[in-house]
Amino acid sequence: PRDNQAAISAGLDFLFAGRRHHNWSDFSALQDPSDTWVTAFVLAQLAQIPADWLGNAREQQVRQSLEWLLSVQGSDGGWGFNLRAESDAESTAWAARALRGCRLRVPESAARFIERCRRSDGGIGAYAPESPSGRAWSIGSPDVTALAASVLGSSSGAPGRAPDPAATDFLRSCWLQTNRPLPAFRVQSRFYTCALLLELEAPEGAWPVLEKLCELMSWNKADNAFDQALLLRCLTGLQIQKSASVAAGLRRMQRPDGGWPASALITLASGRASGSEMGQSDDQRIVTTVAAICALAQCKDVASPVKMGGI
C-alpha cells in the first residue's frame, strides 16, 4: 500500500478527475443523483486539509466550485440534495461549513433556514416543520443537529463562538446519554454523528464522546472504507494512538486508481423516495474518497507536504 503522502496525492488526483462543470456528482444510480449535497460535502472536507496539499491549480478549482455552490442557493436560503430537491438543513449546513471553511461569508439566510428547522426538543430536523417532508419528521435528528450546531453558533461565519446551546443539550439527551440514540437522517454510518460531534468538543472535554465511541466500537467493526475514514477522524480527534493502525488499514483499502471503494451509504428519507432509493452507495466513489483523504490528512502521523517536498 501507499504511504500517507502518496495515498493523499493519489486520492486527490482521483477526486479532481471526477469533477465536472464546476461541481461533483455522485449516487448516479438514483433517479436524481446528488450534485449540490455532494459538492458541499466535498468542499467542506477539502477545507479541513492543509492548503499545501492542493496547490494553486486545484485551489482555483475549489474557488470555482464555491462560486457554483453560492449560485445554486435556494430562494428560501437553503440547499438541497440536488438542484431539484427541496432544501434541507443537512445540505444547507454542509454548504455553510464549506463556505466558512474557505473563509467566505455564510449568507445569513442559510442560518435562518436552519433555524426554521428547529424542533421543540432543541434539535434540528432535516426539513422545516411546515413543509410536507417536515411534517413527516417531527423530531430533531442527531446528525443534522451536530452538523448544524456550529453553523448556528457562528451564523455570521465568524469562528470562535460556542456551538448552539439548545442543540448541544439535545445531543446530550438524545444521542450521548442513551442506549437507544435516534437514527441518522441521511448518511447511514455508525460513526457519522460521533465524528461530527467531536468537531464541537475539544479533546479535553470529549469524555462523553469517547464513551460513546467505545460503545460503538464494542459492537461494530469499521469494515468498509467510509466507516474506517470516520473512525479514523474520531480517533484522531480524541488523540488516541490506535489511529495509526486504522490509518494503515484505510490505506490498504485504496484502489490502484487512487479512489476508495464505494461505501458511503445514504437513505433518502424525505418520505417520497422509491424503494430502490432507500439505501444507495456512492457508486462514483467521490464521497468515500474525499472522506478518506480528509481523515488521512488530519491523522497525527502525516508529515507536512512542505517538509516532504510537496505534491
Where do the model's predicted regions map?
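An alpha-helical repeat/solenoid feature that recognizes helix-turn-helix modules
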Residues: 1-10, 25-62, 75-109, 119-166, ...
